[in-house]
């Protein structure tokens, strides 16, 4: 088990996170329960922030990719750590503004931003909008004129770098729905078009090659391609980008199949990337751009676990043993989407050695409702508390009320003390927005 300094086994043989006993958490708050370690989140913010300060003389900004985990308390933590935020919807923007983020540190993404979302961004002086289509560029130019602004923008570019990860989270393939391709010339054409817009100020480019990537070389290759493109645009249009956003995608540990990247390791990723940017700036005779990076999963992923209570156990002789829990795809759809792998721990018997391989199933009425497949556990019993590790990213943020199940609450742990940061839902919440027409009364 990769503890990453947030998890340990205490004298009772129970799993702890951030100094809090997971069995006690399950008893106090119930299950399913998302648990987040505040210290881990803060530390990862500092790792990235300090690396830019150390290796790039502070000529950049870390943006938390908030789609990984979105709630007011986490946004507040990120803001307090003096990094920026990227948002991909009106709802995420609303949350960032409510959390008090300075508008100039908010970057807005999305391949199909609604007109209402663009207007909302302009009305609230959002610092930079990342443009992903001609229609968006035209709409934003018109809206900027309407609001008397000259909006700063980046253009999302697809550098054509193949990242070795699940194909659903590769975002820089030639056929991706995101960005303008370098290979077919569309990135060049949109640049020429954008610099003629009177009410938009093109600051530079954004790219993002995918998620859960461990190969340093993939990021370096993307940086190389982007710096070469910056030089091309300088030569062709006398436009020299002053901002380069290289996105995020740094991998985290889910199982022992994954690399265990230390905090220093993440800093070394940035050090290598920054060295390449500096070298290419010199080689191509362009200025070193203001650098933006967008870590999300690596800030919150390993900070979180999910606690479940074991219910029914079904052993199909010679085939498979199912251990059913009180959660499932409504609180973690990643297995259904990506066949995601996780590590499971019997939180109330954490010092016991695994004795069997089981599949942890959810309670939804779906055959594909699996939390994690083929995991090693001791012989668990009904009532045991299971912890699924590294669930801080893309679990709560992707949760739903499927089968009219309640989305679990979230508690934040600091120095052994846990507090709600997302309250439990109630059955009343499920029907709060339901409307029954008069004819059906």
Annotate each predicted stretch with a short phrase:
Residues 65, 152-158, 206-208, 245-247, ...:
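Short beta-strand segments
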Residues 160-312, 403, 414:
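Active-site loop/helix belt of alpha/beta enzymes
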Residues 20, 36-43, 69, 135, ...:
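Conserved active-site and cofactor/substrate-binding residues in soluble primary-metabolism enzymes
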Residues 1-129, 134-152, 188, 192-201, ...:
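A charged N-terminal "starter" segment
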Residues 98-101, 122-123, 145-148, 170-172, ...:
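Solvent-exposed alpha-helices and their adjacent loops that cap or buttress functional pockets
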Residues 68-70, 91, 112-114, 133-135, ...:
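Active-site-proximal loop/turn and secondary-structure-junction residues that shape catalytic pockets
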Residues 286-441:
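Charged (often Lys/Glu-rich) extended helix/loop segments that serve as interaction or gating elements
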């Amino acid at each position: 088990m990769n503890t990453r300094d947030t998890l340990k086994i205490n004298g009772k043989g129970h799993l702890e996170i951030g100094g809090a006993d997971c069995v006690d958490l399950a008893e106090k708050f119930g299950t399913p329960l998302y648990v987040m370690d505040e210290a881990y989140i803060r530390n990862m913010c500092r790792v990235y922030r300090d690396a830019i300060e150390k290796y790039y003389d502070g000529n950049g900004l870390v943006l938390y990719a908030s789609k990984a985990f979105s709630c007011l308390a986490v946004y507040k933590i990120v803001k307090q750590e003096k990094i920026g935020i990227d948002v991909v919807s009106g709802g995420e923007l609303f949350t960032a503004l409510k959390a008090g983020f300075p508008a100039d540190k908010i970057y807005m993404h999305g391949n199909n931003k609604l007109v209402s979302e663009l207007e909302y961004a302009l009305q609230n002086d959002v610092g930079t909008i990342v443009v992903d289509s001609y229609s968006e560029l035209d709409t934003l130019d018109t809206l900027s004129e309407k609001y008397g602004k000259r909006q700063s923008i980046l253009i999302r570019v697809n550098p054509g770098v193949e990242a070795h990860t699940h194909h659903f989270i590769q975002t820089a393939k030639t056929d991706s729905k995101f960005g303008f391709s370098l290979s077919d010339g569309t990135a060049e054409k949109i640049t020429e078009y954008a610099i003629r817009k009177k009410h938009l100020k093109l600051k530079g480019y954004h790219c993002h090659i995918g998620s859960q990537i461990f190969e340093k070389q993939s990021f370096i290759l993307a940086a190389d391609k982007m710096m070469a493109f910056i030089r091309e645009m300088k030569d062709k249009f006398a436009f020299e980008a002053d901002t380069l956003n290289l996105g995020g995608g740094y991998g985290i540990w889910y199982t022992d199949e994954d690399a265990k990247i230390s905090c220093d390791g993440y800093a070394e990723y940035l050090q290598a990337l920054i060295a390449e940017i500096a070298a290419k700036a010199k080689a191509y005779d362009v200025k070193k751009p203001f650098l933006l990076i967008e870590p999300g999963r690596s800030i919150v992923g390993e900070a979180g676990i999910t606690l479940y209570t074991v219910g029914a156990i079904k052993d199909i002789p010679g085939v498979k043993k199912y251990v059913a829990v009180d959660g499932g795809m409504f609180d973690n759809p990643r297995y259904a989407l990506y066949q995601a792998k996780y590590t499971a721990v019997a939180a109330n018997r954490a010092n016991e050695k695994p004795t069997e391989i089981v599949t942890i199933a959810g309670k939804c009425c779906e055959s594909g409702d699996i939390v994690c497949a083929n995991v090693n556990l001791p012989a668990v019993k009904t009532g045991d508390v299971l912890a699924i590790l590294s669930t801080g990213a893309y679990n709560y943020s992707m949760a739903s009320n499927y089968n009219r199940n309640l989305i679990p609450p979230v508690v934040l742990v600091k120095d052994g003390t846990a507090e709600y940061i997302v309250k439990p839902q109630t059955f009343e919440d499920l029907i709060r927005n339901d409307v029954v027409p008069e004819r059906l009364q």
